[in-house]
Curated annotation (Swiss-Prot):
Its EC number is 1.1.5.4. It comes from Escherichia coli O127:H6 (strain E2348/69 / EPEC). Its cofactor is FAD. This is Probable malate:quinone oxidoreductase. Signal peptide: none annotated.
Length: 548
């Protein structure tokens, strides 16, 4: 085993050397203030912010595929959830004493409110058009069965009522009520089975690909914005004045050009890690990546689709990563409703759906190989889970579906391969390396280059993530009166928390719902529930989480 590891490592280092040596000779040079690498929602969001903050800055976006929003941002390559912790049970972990921690749920919800405000502002500006084309009201539900899980959901519901962000959530253990909310989930279910559900009417389904296309189309209307498709970054070199020379190859005709940029953003999804490494900044040495893909079962049968209007999330099974929770979702893609169930984890060494099988190997370096090995050794349960997922048969996946849709018929469903999610592995002084769930902005000390690594919650929090990037790399400008005024016009709640302020929460939800054409009714009284039994939990090794 050691010999195999050594051989693979040598190959990886060799591939990196070849990659770095094979610089394309550029025939011309272009200058730009901002270079956006990747045509996904992150680059589109950052470009939209900067267009308002500094309209005179020139921007260039390069994308290796023939169109924008074709990788992870594509509506078919993600679950399309407006992640706000209304139903995702992994955001409310149970403490050892049995109580429920809501800190992460509050943070996720606050972040999504920023996204809603950002999108609403762009609709008012005419940048985003026809909100129904990219965001729709789809109630968010949690659904569990079994005494322990029902008790957990009771405790979760009670805990979330402490936050103004979760007012309006409903709770029920009544079969008839839950059937009214989600008939597809309840029909054919054992009437004696102990079940519970929560439902929040203001949940959303979001087509991030459509948002991306509309944002970039608006940017293209300005003469100082350039979009270059079928263009792949081959090299990044820092200049003496701290600007960057980036070599970009035209994949159609084989030519190349140099782009000289004052600031570079690497928003290339799974490819971001390799490009960050190519930049040579010391901060990149702390990171490695591990790719995990996802599959969904899809139904377009009208009898199924018209019988389900909700996103219904369950609870991850014991020993599985919390984020692997199964869910059966209404999606609205290009104006058409479909139902998805999953995800089922898949494995490929590609960092992108349209990537190379050598991606994982070529990102392995002398700096990150040890953290990767530590993560593998310390997370055997995660390895077992991934192996078990890869080995699933068609029958296994169908049986998993029937737990959420008892009357499902095989002929109504097909299997769809969604996008790749590169998980962050970061060097850790104590453990050697840790698997980090979430996204992370990595930048140099000078604030001239930044990359976004990670996968979750991803697109639904693009607006707050890019806001964080602005604060990190343009700190002096962000603190200026001009930028402060503009940012508060884009995001009215910027600089303050909505949680705990009922009036402010209702005001922002009312405003964004009206502009985005979403359903919103002021919350009514809290549902009465049986008192949860806060049972002490067994202290178990935490299963590392991953994003699918």
């Amino acid at each position: 085993m050691k010999k195999v590891t050594a051989m693979l490592f040598s190959m990886a280092v060799g591939l990196n050397a070849v990659s770095m040596a094979a610089k394309v000779k550029a025939s011309e040079e272009q200058e730009t203030d901002v270079l956006l690498i990747g045509g996904g929602i992150m680059s589109a969001t950052l470009g939209t912010y900067l267009r308002e903050l500094e309209p005179e800055w020139s921007m260039t976006m390069v994308e290796r595929l023939e169109g924008v929003a074709q990788e992870s941002s594509n509506g078919w390559n993600n679950a399309g959830t407006g992640h706000s912790a209304l139903m995702e049970l992994n955001y409310t972990p149970q403490n050892v004493d049995g109580s429920i921690s809501i800190e992460k749920a509050v943070a996720i919800n606050e972040a999504f409110q920023i996204s809603r405000q950002f999108w609403a502002h762009q609709v008012e500006r005419g940048v985003l058009r026809t909100p129904r084309s990219f965001i729709n009201t789809v109630p968010h539900m949690s659904f569990v069965w079994g005494e322990d899980n029902v008790n957990f959901l009771r405790a979760r519901y009670a805990a979330l009522q402490q936050s103004s962000l979760f007012r309006g959530m409903r709770y029920s253990e009544d079969h008839a009520q839950i059937k009214e909310w989600a008939p597809l989930v309840m029909e054919g279910r054992d009437p004696q089975q102990k079940v519970a559900a929560t439902r929040t009417e203001i949940g959303t389904d979001v087509n991030y690909g459509e948002i991306t296309r509309q944002l970039i189309a608006s940017l293209q209307k300005k003469s100082n914005f350039s979009l270059q498709l079928s263009s792949e970054v081959r090299a990044l070199k820092r200049n003496d004045d701290n600007s960057w020379t980036v070599t970009v190859a035209d994949l159609k005709n084989g030519t190349a050009q140099n782009i000289r940029a004052k600031f570079v953003f690497i928003g290339a999804g799974g490819a971001a890690l390799k490009l960050l490494q190519e930049s040579g900044i010391p901060e990149a040495k702390d990171y490695a990546g591990f790719p995990v893909g996802g599959q969904f079962l899809v139904s377009e049968n009208p009898d199924v689709v018209n019988h389900h209007l909700a996103k219904v999330y369950g609870k991850a099974s014991v020993g599985a990563p919390p984020m692997s929770v199964p869910h059966i979702d209404t999606r609205v893609l290009d104006g058409k409703r479909v139902v998805l169930f999953g995800p089922f984890a898949t494995f490929s060494t590609k960092f992108l759906k349209n990537g190379s099988l050598w991606d994982l190997m070529s990102s392995t370096t002398t700096s990150n190989v040890m953290p990767m090995m530590h993560v593998g050794l310390d997370n055997f349960d995660l390895v077992k889970y991934l192996v078990s997922q890869v080995m699933l048969s068609e029958e296994d996946r169908f049986e998993a579906l029937k737990e959420y849709y008892p009357q499902a018929k095989k002929e109504d469903w097909r299997l769809w391969q969604a996008g790749q999610r590169v998980q962050i592995i970061k060097r850790d002084a104590d453990k050697g390396g840790v698997l980090r769930l979430g996204t992370e902005v990595v930048s140099d000390q000078q604030g001239t280059i930044a990359a976004l690594l990670g996968a979750s919650p991803g697109a639904s929090t693009a607006a707050p993530i890019m806001l964080n990037l602005l604060e990190k790399v343009f700190g002096d400008r962000v603190s200026s009166p001009q930028w402060q005024a503009t940012l508060k016009a884009i995001v009215p709640s910027y600089g303050r928390k909505l949680n705990g302020d009922v009036a402010a929460t209702e005001r922002e939800l009312q405003y964004t719902s009206e502009v985005l054409g979403l359903k919103y009714d002021k919350p009514q009284a809290v549902d009465s529930t049986p008192k949860p039994q806060l049972k002490p939990q067994l202290v178990q090794k935490e299963v590392a989480d991953i994003a699918l």
